[in-house]
Amino acid sequence: MNDSVNFRSFKKGDYEVCCEWWKWWWKSSGQDPVIRAFLPKDERCFIIEKNGVPVACYFLFIMEPSIVGWTTYLVSNPQYNERDRREIIKLLVTNVEKEAEKIGIMQLFTVCGNQQMSNIHESLDWMLIPVKNEAFKYLTNNFKK
């Protein structure tokens, strides 16, 4: 069977899926899912799927002026336990970087939230700064425009 990985922006029902994931991941803290109004519009909310199964979501905020972006609230499917989980999450981050480059973003910031996310971002050439779990990356292709 050929595996199909699909990266896309949100469609109806995706926010509710993320809420279920946040509830699972944040159950020990008692934190509520992110309120929809705090997230960007659907075209800046991204999801990656494998064989039709949602694996993870990531959100891109664009600052004004629109050369700086902020990615946040990366959440993954707690039921997806395949060996390629980390690689699919890395692909999600990479694809969101590409979306940011398309619209002229030159630098991305994120708060990684935990060591696994820090490791993933660092492996993708994000520069980790000496504040716990924060990282940024210059999207240098946009410096040449």
For every predicted segment, state its role.
Residues 47, 53-62, 68-72:
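Conserved beta-strand in the GNAT
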Residues 13-17, 66, 115-116:
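Short alpha-helical
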Residues 69-125:
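Acyl-donor binding region in acyl/amide transferases
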Residues 111, 127-142:
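Conserved catalytic-core motifs of GNAT/GCN5-like acyltransferases
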Residues 22-51:
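Active-site rim helix/loop that mediates acceptor-substrate recognition in acyltransferases
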Residues 58-59, 142-145:
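Charged, low-complexity C-terminal accessory regions
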Residues 1-33, 132, 145:
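Short amphipathic alpha-helix that is part of the acyltransferase structural core
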